[in-house]
Amino acid sequence: MQYLVFDPRFGAAGDMILSALLALGADRSAVSRAVSAVSNLTIEETERRGIPALSLKTNTGKAHRTLEDIIQIIDAADASAEAKALAKQVFNRIQKAEETVHQSHHVHFHEVGADDAIADVLGSC
């Protein structure tokens, strides 16, 4: 059995997580199809400090969405039912955290509602 240790204690951007998953063998065409509901995805091979890596570029379009808006985008995505369910769980958890922080049930996603953030979550799921 093989193990993968993911330690985000010092932070990890969504595009970094998705790049790592793609470098580990995630299906590039499936990921591109999934994120196409919200963004175009460009994958480039690069090198960082002498280490081969992948660089992702997505559109950074519209932001300021509600959870319902994001759920509609996820539902329209060309992704597996499992990936859609997991992406919805991620955004539901973010919604609950935002409600707690802002002490309100009327939450709008700002950066997290942007096209690139939704693409990062959908692609990683």
Task: Please report, for each region that a protein language model flagged, where it lies by residue.
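Glycine/charged-rich beta-loop-alpha catalytic/anionic-binding loops adjacent to active sites
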Residues: 1-3, 100-111
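Conserved phosphate/anionic-ligand binding catalytic regions in large, soluble enzymes, centered on
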Residues: 6-19, 109-125
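Glycine-rich nucleotide/cofactor/substrate-binding loop typically near the N-terminus or early
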Residues: 23-102
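N-terminal phosphate-binding or glycine-rich loops at protein starts, especially the Walker A/P-loop
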Residues: 1-39
